[in-house]
A protein has these predicted regions:
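N-terminal, charge-rich interaction modules
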Residues: 82, 88-149
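Glycine-rich, often proline-containing surface loops adjacent to acidic residues and nearby aromatics
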Residues: 98-99, 176-192
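Phosphate/oxyanion-binding active-site loops and adjacent basic polyanion-contact surfaces
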Residues: 111-118, 168-175, 200-204
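Active-site metal-binding core of divalent-cation-utilizing nuclease and nuclease-like domains
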Residues: 137-182
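Nucleic-acid nuclease catalytic cores
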Residues: 186-188, 193-200, 212-243
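Short, hydrophobic/π-rich interface segment
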Residues: 192-216, 392-409
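Donor-sugar nucleotide-binding helix/loop cap in glycosyltransferases
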Residues: 247-441
Length: 441
C-alpha cells in the first residue's frame, strides 16, 4: 500500500494563515510574529503544520521570505528570520569497525530499519562507548517531555543578535529526546535520523541541551547527532560555545562506524567487469542526481514504506525537484518502479532488484550497486577512462561517452542538447567518483 501525503497542503495552510493574520507584514515591521496552535488549527493540525526538520521542508511562504518557526510554549510558536538550521560539516573520516556481541540474536545489521534500532545497535555494539569515551554508559531519559524555562539569542539573516530586547523566551515547550546515555563523566543526548540530509534543525539539539544543562548541575551535557544509512553509522558531537546563543554550536568531533566488512578492492571490481553485460538505455530520463549516497538512501526509505513522491518531499530532506530527480535516478537503474495506486496517485516501490539489496551484506550490496551502474555504457566508459588515466575525464569527454551510449530524451527520442548533456555529465562523474571512493575506503 502506498503511503500518501496531501499535495503540499502545508503551502496552502500558511498562505491562508498569512492572509488572515498578516504574518509577513508584521515580521517586516517588528521582526517576529507569535501564532497559537488554536489559530493554526483552523486550517491544519498544528503538529503537522509546524514540523520542518530540514530547511527544505519549510512551506513556500517561509522559503520565499526567509522565515523559520520555533515553539516557545506548549501552544505558541515564534516565526521570524532566525537562522534555525545548521549545515552538516562535510568531513570524511576513516571507518571504525566494531562487532556486536555474539549472544545478541534479536537484532542484526540487516534488520536496522528505524532510528530506535539504529540507536540500540550503536549502544550494544560499543559504538557509543567508543565515540563518547565514557565509562559505564547506560540508557536513561527518552521520549517527549516539557522543557525548562530559558531565553536565547539567535542569528537573523546572517547577523548575530545579542540585544536583550531580541531574546526569545521558551517556557514549558514540548521537547523530544530519541535517547540519552549517561556515563561517569557526562550525559549524551541523542538525535537520530535514517535520512541523509544537508542540514538539521538546531532546536532538536538546543532545546534538550538547555533543559538538561539546567537539570544536571555540574555534569556536562553533550548533544550528539546519529545518522544511519547504508550500514554506516555517522556520529557528530556538537557543543554550544555560548549557552544563551542558539547559533553558537560547533562540531567537536565526527566519526564513522560499521559492523561489517566494507573492504572492496580493485580486484573485486575487475571480477564484475569480466562478466559485465550492458543494459539497454531505459525509457526514463537520464540521471541528474549527483549524490549516489542519496540514491541509496531513497531506496532505504522505500524499503520501509512504498510512498508517493510528495511524502518523500515532506517527510525527508528532499525538495520537490530533488524527489523527482532521485526517484528517476533509482528508476533508471532498475531499483524503483512507478505505478498508480487505487486513487490515481503515482506510487513508488522497490523492484525485486531493489528489495534484494537490503538482504545483502554491505560488501555484497556495494558490489551489486557498482555492477548496476557500470552496466550502463556511459558510466562504464567513464570508469574505464578514469582507470586508464588515473584521473576523471573532462566534462566534454563524458558528454562524448553519453552520446556513444546512445542516450536519448525519452520524451522526444532525440539526443539531449549539449547543455543538458553537460548537466548529466556531472552525475556520471559523481557516480564514478562514488565507485572510486568505495574502492579506496
Amino acid at each position: 500500500m502506498c503511503k500518501i501525503s496531501k499535495a503540499r497542503k502545508i503551502d496552502e495552510t500558511w498562505e491562508k494563515l498569512n492572509k488572515k493574520y498578516n504574518i509577513v507584514k508584521t515580521i517586516n515591521s517588528i521582526g517576529y510574529y507569535k501564532i497559537s496552535a488554536d489559530e493554526i488549527k483552523e486550517f491544519q493540525e498544528p503538529r503537522l503544520a509546524v514540523k520542518f526538520d530540514h530547511a527544505d521542508d519549510r512551506p513556500k511562504l517561509f522559503m520565499e521570505h526567509g522565515l523559520s518557526i520555533l515553539p516557545i510554549t506548549r501552544g505558541d510558536y515564534y516565526i521570524s528570520r532566525i537562522k534555525a538550521y545548521h549545515n552538516f560539516e562535510s568531513i570524511s573520516s576513516d571507518i571504525t569497525y566494531l562487532t556486536p556481541p555474539e549472544h545478541i540474536k534479536s537484532l542484526d545489521v540487516t534488520s536496522i530499519n528505524s532510528e530506535s534500532k539504529a540507536l540500540n545497535m550503536a549502544y550494544i555494539s560499543g559504538i557509543l562507548a567508543d565515540f563518547l569515551e565514557d565509562e559505564n554508559l547506560l540508557p536513561t531519559v527518552s521520549g517527549r517531555m516539557s522543557s525548562e524555562s530559558f531565553a536565547f539569542y539567535a542569528n537573523v539573516v546572517g547577523e548575530a543578535v545579542t540585544d536583550e530586547d531580541s531574546a526569545v523566551t521558551v517556557e514549558n515547550s514540548q521537547i523530544e529526546i530519541d535517547a540519552a546515555y549517561e556515563g561517569v563523566k557526562s550525559l549524551a543526548l541523542m538525535e537520530a535520523k535514517r535520512d541523509l540530509t544537508d542540514n538539521f534543525l538546531i532546536r532538536q539539539l538546543y532545546y534538550p541541551f538547555r533543559t538538561w544543562h539546567q537539570k544536571m548541575a555540574k555534569k556536562p551535557v553533550r548533544p550528539v547527532f546519529l545518522i544511519y544509512s547504508n550500514s554506516i553509522f555517522y556520529l557528530y558531537e556538537y557543543r554550544f560555545n555560548d549557552l544563551q546563543h542558539y547559533n553558537s554550536l560547533e562540531l567537536v568531533k565526527h566519526k564513522r562506524y560499521c559492523l561489517e566488512d566494507t573492504h572492496i578492492s580493485v580486484e573485486d571490481v575487475q571480477k564484475i567487469l569480466k562478466k559485465l553485460r550492458f543494459n539497454k538505455e531505459p525509457k526514463i530520463q537520464f540521471p541528474q542526481a549527483n549524490s549516489f549516497e542519496r540514491v541509496i538512501n531513497i531506496c532505504e526509505l522505500l524499503y520501509i514504506n512504498d510512498v508517493e513522491k510528495n511524502f518523500i518531499t515532506e517527510e525527508y530532506s528532499f525538495d520537490v525537484r530533488q524527489s523527482s530527480y532521485y526517484l528517476d535516478a533509482a528508476r533508471y537503474l532498475g531499483l524503483v518502479e512507478k505505478s498508480l495506486d487505487l486513487d490515481g496517485h503515482d506510487c513508488y516501490t522497490l523492484t525485486q532488484l531493489g528489495k534484494s539489496l537490503f538482504s545483502m551484506s554491505y560488501k555484497q550490496r556495494q558490489l551489486k550497486l557498482i555492477e548496476t551502474i557500470l552496466s550502463y555504457k556511459s558510466f562504464y566508459l567513464t570508469y574505464e577512462a578514469y582507470r586508464n588515466n588515473n584521473e576523471m575525464p573532462s566534462k566534454a569527454e563524458i558528454v562524448s561517452y553519453i552520446r556513444q551510449a546512445g542516450v536519448v530524451d525519452p520524451k522526444t527520442g532525440l539526443p539531449y542538447s549539449d547543455s543538458t548533456n553537460k548537466r548529466r555529465a556531472s552525475t556520471v562523474s559523481a557516480w564514478v567518483r562514488w565507485i572510486i571512493n568505495t574502492i579506496n575506503n
